Amino acid sequence: MRPKLLSVEAALFLALPELARAATRKFDFEIGWVRANPDNAFERPVIGINGQWPIPTIEVDIGDRVIINAHNNLGNQSTSLHFHGLYMNGSTHMDGPAGVSQCPIIPGTSFTYNFTVDQPGTYWYHSHTAAQYPDGLRGPFIVHDKDFPYAKKYDEEVVLTLSDWYHDEMRSLIPQFMAKSNPSGAEPVPKNALMNETTNFTMSVQPEKTYLFRVINVGAFAGQYLWFEGHKMQIVEVDGIYTEEAEAEMIYISAAQRVSFLLTTKKDTSKNFPIVASMDTTLFDVLPPDLKYNSTGWLVYDKKAEKPVPATVDSLNPFDDMTLVPYDKMEILGKPDKEVVLDVKMDNLKDGKNYAFFNDITYTEAKVPTLYTALSAGKDAEDPAVYGTYTHSMVLKKNEIVQLVVNNLDSGRHPFHLHGHAFQSVYRSEEEAGIWADANVTEKNLPKTPMRRDTLVIYPNGNIVMRFKADNPGVWLFHCHIEWHVISGLIATFVEDPLALQETIEIPKNHLDACAAANMPTKGNAAANTEDFLDLTGENKPANTLPPGFTPRGIVALVFSCICGILGVAVVAWYGFSAPVGSTSAGALSAGLVENDSGDVHSAQKGPQETVVSPTGDARSH
């Protein structure tokens, strides 16, 4: 037995330097409203931390323990924090989505996140409650790595965020979006694009130096094309996964994606160069005349030289991220044990509003956070039914290889994000290619070492195929990261090895207190039933479906037909009952008063003869 003991001691001794380097990083966050005007066009309330906005960048080292004490000072909104891209291995209860892995943090209360970071790379943190993060609660989360393979190739590191920006708060935009008057589901178009939360980003650079850029799209909606005039990028990381170097002149970054690259400056310092980020306007249903879809910054070599206007580009041809090769050259996972196929569509329900669906299910939050159902359901936790119909939960067995197929039956792009994992991106079709089942692609056609990331763009009416290993017990969302589509229900849930969760996860009292404050149960199925976990009576449900034959286009046509009909009848009635020229009702004349169109009362007077166009188009005078 002595040799075995010595080997353990030796292992502990060798681990001591790593343990010594790991630290506990503690953050106290007071989350509250501040005012800001990032685009110099409109000052508005934004959600800041500790009285400041933009919110702080969190920087830690791999192996560090992170403790965040979050206190909600918003007064009028609940909140939560999600750490986008972090696997939260062994800590699924720290993932952050309210109603999924925790209860919301209601105003005036606090919540503690406590987890260890065991992966390097570029991430971000943001609210995961009620589509709140576009109001400003979003910031970078950087995990440094002493073993970064490109550490000796750069001189300086830069974090660069891109985002769209709205002048109205989400609490006013959401009711406009989810309204009967918007049956086609047209998403609100942002007012501006920001670069590092400003429209005037400048970066002083030195000649012949190499910079590591960590770029994060923290926006709510728009993907962005990014390029540096006169310079090339060497991509070295996407979504926390190191890659082999890949040269690019232009990249596309969807909402929630991250790309890191090396950029080497020129020897000549006589000129400055534009940095251009251009929003993907194909996502917008309309292009308002005041829309500013480009954001321009500058690489400044000479502060005295002019900052040139960006040159016009003939076309937008970004680097294809599907061609990236992971640095560790991890090979494609083997034959899938389980295939999940999700069909994306947008449609209306009986309340007249437009919703988003996976396989005809639009996500509706359960009465009990899904994780808490998994922890309290006993052996029933392996039955997807206990999580409710409308959380769209799928139970995964330990270590099974999952092939996740998404067929986009919609005419727009979507960035799909998986919590708890980086998946292998094994296939992406072109636009209008149809569904995966018709693709005629075999295993030998798939890449040997596919790119891995946690957020992948699917093209209009196309498909994507991803693979991952169910080796991280937890409750993990899969959803579109366009925040408007999160609101409208484009979410599914993976419940991974729930019996292992029951053995390893203990919910802290601080988290249970948050549920008590929010008056939310912490045990039971989706309907909060603790007696019979298969009885879903009383579960939260979306509106009923429409009768067959109704489509968004048909609803729009019906609505406008009704409006036109009502207006037509009103005009005819008004014309038929109008008084002869020069006359006014006796009562109004006797009082010397008449009402104008707005209802204001004015002294009676004869106006000039008016010409009115009848519903038939004839001009009539009265």
Curated annotation (Swiss-Prot):
GO terms for biological process: cellular response to iron ion starvation; reductive iron assimilation. Residues 597-622 are annotated as: Disordered. Cu cation 2 binds at H84, H126, H481. Residues 575-622 are cytoplasmic. It is found in: Cell membrane. GO terms for cellular component: high-affinity iron permease complex. Induction: Expression is up-regulated during iron starvation. InterPro entries: Cu-oxidase-like_N, Cu-oxidase_2nd, Cu-oxidase_C, Cu-oxidase_fam, Cu_oxidase_CS, Cu_oxidase_Cu_BS, Cupredoxin, CuRO_2_Fet3-like. GO terms for molecular function: copper ion binding; ferroxidase activity. Cu cation 1 binds at H82, H417. Residues 1-22 form the signal peptide. The chain crosses the membrane at residues 554-574. It is an enzyme of class 1 (oxidoreductase). Cu cation 4 binds at H414, C480, H485. Glycans are attached at N76, N89, N114, N196, N200, N294, N440. Disruption phenotype: Produces wild-type amounts of siderophores and growth at the same rate as the wild-type under iron limitation, but accumulates high levels of free intracellular iron. Does not affect the virulence. Residues 31-146, 156-303, 363-498 form the Plastocyanin-like domain. Cu cation 3 binds at H128, H419, H479. Its EC number is 1.-.-.-. It is a single-pass type I membrane protein. Residues 23-553 are extracellular. The keyword Cytoplasm does not apply. Belongs to the multicopper oxidase family. Cell surface ferroxidase; part of the reductive iron assimilatory system (RIA), a siderophore-independent iron acquisition process. Required to oxidize Fe(2+) and release it from the transporter. Seems not to be involved in virulence. This is Iron transport multicopper oxidase FET3. The lineage of its organism: Eukaryota, Fungi, Dikarya, Ascomycota, Pezizomycotina.
